[in-house]
């Protein structure tokens, strides 16, 4: 398999620039790779421990956003209101800015600082009643290093089959990341987001019948960033499954396809269930939104300063109030955002539960 990949990547292929280039992955790279077991990064929010991947993924974004939001009044944590949606969006912008400045594989990521109460308080103090249109990473580990920011206006490519696989706003299926949650009667519980590539943007290796992964687009070619392309280093992916624990016992698993939106939609879910007391299915079905005011992880890696994508079910009054605060709102239709699924087990009664997203008919909850 490694030799077949080696032979294939040495063949020049046409790039979106119109020029032919060979790949850089070699059999020696694959031979040197070793899978690893890594401790989860955890933080407590309102009595629930939230466990995430390390900073080779974007998992700590969710933890950082929760740390910023935790001390606020419950009324400011309701994503269905203008006040709550504004506060959540602004917290996410700050957490995602730190992702761009500090997250990567194998480096000295200042996670302890980023997830600390003092740092969260300093970030919270940056939130005003107006929507920010700046990328504002904190000095968690010194002076932050960022790549050059680019807007969509700089790109007019008509190339298809590149960038992010997702469902169209209309619900049309064009492929997407996969996520799976499983729980059994004994309390074993798994959250997995195993996606790595997709056929429409990955060349297929004829000898193997499989496609190359495409996550390396999530590295930067500029030198000096936390996720600059380096040999032997994983890209800083968007894959970010979640486990929830209470009193040291696992109670739920959740996650979502959706690229940069994965932790954003999971944040809405956690606020609605932990703070709002909603059922899992109610929280999944509720109107969703996400910010685009940060560099995207998928080519061409642009950002929309102040951007906020909302489902129309947020309501005209809420949407107008968000626009009045300076958010650049894009309406995405009634049932277009969010791809969550979840399972759980009550550690006292042993009762299992599951819930899944109904949007685009791509999520299912099943038990036996």
Residue ranges with predicted function:
Residues 48-55, 61-66, 74, 180-181, ...:
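Short, well-ordered beta-strand elements
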Residues 1-55, 169:
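Accessory "access/gating" subregions that flank catalytic or transport cores
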Residues 33-34, 40, 53-56, 169-173, ...:
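Short Gly/Pro-enriched turn/cap motifs at secondary-structure boundaries
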Residues 5, 14, 23, 71-195, ...:
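Internal maturation/activation junctions in enzymes
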Residues 316-368:
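In a subset of proteins, long, contiguous C-terminal domains/tails are tracked
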Residues 11-26, 157-160, 164, 170-173, ...:
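Active-site rim segments in enzyme catalytic domains, especially the processed small/beta chain
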Residues 105, 186, 232-233, 266, ...:
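Extended C-terminal subregions enriched in glycine
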């Amino acid at each position: 398999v490694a030799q077949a990949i080696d032979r294939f990547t040495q063949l020049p292929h046409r790039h979106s620039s119109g020029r032919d280039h060979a790949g850089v992955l070699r059999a020696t790279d694959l031979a040197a790779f070793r899978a690893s077991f890594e401790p989860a990064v955890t933080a407590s929010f309102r009595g629930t421990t939230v466990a995430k991947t390390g900073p080779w993924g974007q998992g700590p974004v969710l933890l950082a956003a929760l740390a910023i939001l935790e001390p606020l009044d419950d009324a400011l944590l309701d994503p269905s209101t203008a006040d709550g949606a504004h506060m959540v969006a602004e917290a996410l912008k700050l957490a995602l800015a730190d992702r761009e400045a500090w997250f990567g594989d194998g480096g000295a990521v200042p996670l302890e600082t980023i997830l600390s109460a003092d740092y969260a308080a300093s970030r919270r103090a940056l939130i005003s009643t107006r929507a920010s249109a700046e990328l504002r990473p904190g000095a968690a580990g010194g002076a932050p290093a960022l790549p050059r920011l680019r807007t969509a206006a700089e790109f007019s490519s008509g190339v298809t089959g590149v960038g992010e696989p997702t469902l169209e706003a209309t619900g049309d299926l064009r492929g997407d990341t996969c996520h799976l949650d499983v729980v059994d009667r004994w309390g074993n519980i798994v959250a997995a987001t195993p996606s790595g590539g997709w056929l429409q943007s990955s060349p297929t290796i004829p000898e193997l019948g499989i496609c190359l992964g495409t996550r390396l687009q999530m590295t930067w070619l500029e030198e000096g960033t936390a996720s600059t392309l380096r040999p032997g280093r994983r890209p800083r992916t968007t894959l970010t499954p979640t486990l929830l624990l209470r009193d040291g016992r696992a109670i739920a698993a959740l996650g979502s396809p959706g690229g940069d939106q994965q932790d954003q939609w999971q944040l809405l879910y956690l606020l609605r269930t932990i703070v709002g007391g909603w059922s899992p299915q109610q929280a999944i079905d509720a109107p969703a939104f996400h910010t685009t005011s940060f560099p995207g992880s998928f080519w061409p890696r642009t950002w929309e300063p102040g951007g906020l994508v909302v489902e129309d079910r947020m309501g005209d009054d809420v949407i107008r109030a968000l626009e009045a605060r300076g958010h650049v709102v894009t309406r995405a239709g009634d049932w277009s955002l969010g791809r969550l699924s979840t399972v759980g087990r009550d550690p006292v009664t042993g009762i299992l539960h599951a819930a899944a997203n109904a949007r685009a008919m791509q999520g299912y909850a099943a038990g036996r």
